[in-house]
Amino acid sequence: MNTETKPLPAWLDKVRWDDNGLVPVIAQEASTNDVLMFAWMNREALAKTIETQRAVYYSRSRKRLWFKGEESGHVQHVHEVRLDCDEDVVLLKVEQVSGIACHTGRHSCFFQKFEGTVDAGDWVAVDPVLKDPEHIYK
């Protein structure tokens, strides 16, 4: 069995990785341009995302790769990968399987909207729960 790790491609060097070797990533629905979520990638996650055409992130809390949908089935098929003008943010244009990107069971992680004024305002959930998270994660 070959246990050698294949070297990572040189194009990864164009990305401006932070001091922890990570880059912020925004996932956007390709068909609607809805912003679905924000996450992080390391070099291996970005390379695997491009190789598999499925979103792979890096979990800072678990300190490991996180294959989007590995537990929920709500995978993201990647249509495009873009790098911003400063080369320090990645944008994934994805097809969100089942329409649920958020662990709360919503379409987007950005479901809270600020309403009111600076002195009398609050964050309000404005998008519906599409599926109870207790039925998503077992």
Swiss-Prot record:
Its EC number is 3.5.4.19. Mg(2+) binds at residues 84, 86, 88. Its cofactor is Mg(2+); Zn(2+). Keywords: Amino-acid biosynthesis, Cytoplasm, Histidine biosynthesis, Hydrolase, Magnesium, Metal-binding, Zinc. The keyword Transport does not apply. GO terms for cellular component: cytoplasm. It is an enzyme of class 3 (hydrolase). It comes from the Bacteria. Zn(2+) binds at residues 85, 102, 109. Binds 1 Mg(2+) ion per subunit. One of its GO terms (molecular function) is magnesium ion binding. Pfam families: PRA-CH. It catalyses: 1-(5-phospho-beta-D-ribosyl)-5'-AMP + H2O = 1-(5-phospho-beta-D-ribosyl)-5-[(5-phospho-beta-D-ribosylamino)methylideneamino]imidazole-4-carboxamide. Pathway: Amino-acid biosynthesis; L-histidine biosynthesis; L-histidine from 5-phospho-alpha-D-ribose 1-diphosphate: step 3/9. GO terms for biological process: L-histidine biosynthetic process. Belongs to the PRA-CH family. Homodimer. This is Phosphoribosyl-AMP cyclohydrolase. It comes from Burkholderia multivorans (strain ATCC 17616 / 249). The gene is hisI.
